Amino acid sequence: MAENGKAKYYALMEEMKTDILSGKIRPGEKLPSENQLSVRYGLSRHTVRKALGILAGDGYIESFQGKGTFCADVLRQIHGTGNIAVVTTYISDYIFPRLIQGIDEVLSDNGYSIILKNTGNSRQKEARFLEELISKGIDGLIIEPSKSEVLCRHVSLYETLDKYQIPYIFIQGLYTEMQEKPHILMDDAGGSYLVTKHLLDSGRRNIAGFFKADDRQGIERHKGYVKALQEHEIAYDPDKVVWFHTEDRRKKPALMVRNMVRQNSFPDGIVCYNDQIAVQVMEELERQGKKIPEDVAVTGYDNSLYARQGQGITTITHPQEKLGEMAAKLLLEKLSGVPDEESKVERLIRPELIVRGSSVKTGI
């Protein structure tokens, strides 16, 4: 087994496939012999032969009697497929069904079919899907990046898309290394500023924040929270900020609420990264005997179905279907060669505050 836990032949196959897709091994380039590859990678000829067999079966390489093995031009027929790939962190819940619906309606009306992929916010899955989509052939890509605040180690795959003039649109996040690429984003800092200001204007002064550390939305929403505190001359206290990651998002928020109760340092307001986190926080508050909003006011983000149930959650609008439509229209512009200065698609979506019972008494 390789160090990453994969069979050695499979690890070699993946490495060579990445080299082909990134252009490190070019179409028509002759590959080293089995013996040479065996020496280079420190593997048996049998292992090398097995890896080459998979690459040949997938169309990445081709052998000619008496001449050797060559890199195939797997991207030669990549355009004109009629397929647009849509890669999001999740598909079946929260805001994603309506977002995807918006994309599909616009693309279907223009004769395209969509290929859906769900990364689960995994970088490894994102890279694997990109390799697969590039090799199968797509006309364009709409993608929500996974863990967009973490260094992207598969930039070469996006460079391959650029090389073969396959347009792609980022939605809801953007890798630091690719800030200039086409995108549709929410004004996340502005939205978080609005909910924090709402709590401050309602008389709350001891306000905690729960934010996601591994994506752009979390970082931007934290910025909005800080800005509102500064404008109201309230000192920023890092001890009142809870940072969580994709892996601990289902456990850490509730755990930190319990810790606040035990330490007797309870806030009178909590700004949450999104509506899902707000629900977790509110459920734990109630288990700890706290009343909402009398003891603690809570806000969310995204105006999802979660925010419209029960007493309701004060939140920020998310256009969902409209965002999908905007991304699809921008991609169609790119496919048609419309210059950026002539684009009719808005790139930044302005936030709107929706006040509900989680932050103010409604009288119901």
Spell out what each predicted region is.
Residues 179-209, 227, 250-258, 278, ...:
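Hydrophobic alpha-helical segments within soluble ligand-binding/sensing domains
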Residues 4, 14-18, 72-194, 262:
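Alpha-helical recognition/docking segments in bacterial nutrient-uptake
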Residues 27-29, 206, 236-240, 292-297:
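Short acidic capping loops at alpha-helix termini that bridge into adjacent secondary structure
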Residues 193-234, 341-359:
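An alpha-beta-alpha
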Residues 94-109, 191, 217-236, 280, ...:
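Short, solvent-exposed amphipathic alpha-helices that sit
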Residues 108-118, 209, 228-250:
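Short beta-strand elements in bilobed, periplasmic/extracellular small-molecule ligand-binding domains
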Residues 14-15, 254-364:
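Flexible loop/turn connectors
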Residues 1-78:
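N-terminal helix-turn-helix DNA-binding module of bacterial transcription factors
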